[in-house]
């Protein structure tokens, strides 16, 4: 995971069961994945920049699909496995996350929260405190960094919940957070059975 460099550039727009996703990369590394229009998504990735994005389909029918960069193919395979409920999940693409040192410390901890597991903001703050060179880490500061996570789903900010199991916020919208946690069997009736097995068809190898 890298931590410095130039601004993100919009690259690809792809459908998902929870709405369109915008995927960005830098130097062959995944640097951003947002639900379209979500809070904290860079302005350049909103609707006015959409013509600059390459639209992808999960059936691989787009003419340029064979020429996709390796990190894009890896991201697509991971997302298909995730939304299809295929475990264990494949390896993550290489990540190029940009933020303050504190934000990077929080995001590194998010990478260690497993599928179908939730962690409170307070517990996350304690984990960050073990690596952060200050005597204490505030829960509000941690929550702010979680909300600024630039790679949705893969860097699992949706698994961070409030005290005593309260849902808490989500930059992509609370409804999406509920759906993602239900898909993983951690929220709501049916423990995710209704949402598991979302179908995406074939992806390029």
List the predicted regions and their residue ranges:
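Long, intrinsically disordered, low-complexity Ser/Thr/Pro-rich regulatory/activation regions
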Residues: 159-184
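Mobile beta-alpha loop/short-helix "lid" or hinge segments that flank ligand
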Residues: 40, 151-153
